[in-house]
């Protein structure tokens, strides 16, 4: 996690890793053992864009984002493209905002302005948002008991 990053161009990065050791980094494990990582640094987070690397038949994060926007009313799509906010721990990888910008731009209409927002506090944004929502008095009417949950499920 500390050494990983998202490649802007995965294939180009693979070629660079194959022809040079410039992408290699050493890391000391808690037991003192030192390991060297190469293309693993960007291959691991690439599964966010290519879940097939993990044997999953699902869309990448960029396609899921695009599909979500396209399912919204046509009148708000422009605003969604211009205000896509990254949140959660998986968005902490360096390079993820630039890659999302590139991928969404390639999927969206050519004249569309794309802006990916990666706030510094995004690692905890999901928790903070849930905390704010849970503290609203209007949200309390949506609460259910454990017994209700056990009976009806999610």
UniProtKB/Swiss-Prot annotation:
It holds the Pfam family Actin. It is found in: Cytoplasm; Cytoplasm, Cytoskeleton. Its EC number is 3.6.4.-. Its main location: cytoplasm. GO terms for molecular function: ATP binding; hydrolase activity. SUPFAM superfamilies: Actin-like ATPase domain. It catalyses: ATP + H2O = ADP + phosphate + H(+). InterPro entries: Actin (IPR004000), Actin_CS (IPR004001), ATPase_NBD (IPR043129). GO terms for cellular component: cytoplasm; cytoskeleton. SMART domains: ACTIN (SM00268). Signal peptide: none annotated. Disulfide bonds: none annotated. Keywords: ATP-binding, Cytoplasm, Cytoskeleton, Hydrolase, Nucleotide-binding. PANTHER family: ACTIN (PTHR11937). Belongs to the actin family. Actins are highly conserved proteins that are involved in various types of cell motility and are ubiquitously expressed in all eukaryotic cells. This is Actin, cytoskeletal 4. It comes from Lytechinus pictus (Painted sea urchin).
């Amino acid at each position: 996690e500390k050494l990983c990053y998202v490649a802007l161009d995965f294939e180009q990065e693979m070629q660079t890793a194959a022809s040079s050791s410039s992408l290699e980094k050493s890391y000391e494990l808690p037991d003192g053992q030192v390991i060297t990582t190469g293309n693993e640094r960007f291959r691991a987070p690439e599964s966010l864009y290519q879940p097939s690397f993990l044997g999953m038949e699902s869309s990448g994060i960029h396609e899921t984002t695009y599909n979500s926007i396209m399912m919204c009313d046509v009148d708000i799509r422009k605003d969604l493209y211009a205000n896509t906010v990254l949140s959660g721990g998986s968005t902490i990888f360096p390079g993820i905002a630039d890659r999302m910008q590139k991928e969404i731009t390639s999927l969206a209409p050519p004249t569309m302005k794309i802006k990916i927002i990666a706030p510094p506090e995004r690692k905890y944004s999901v928790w903070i948002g849930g905390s704010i929502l849970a503290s609203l008095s209007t949200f309390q009417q949506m609460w259910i008991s454990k017994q209700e949950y056990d009976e009806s499920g999610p």
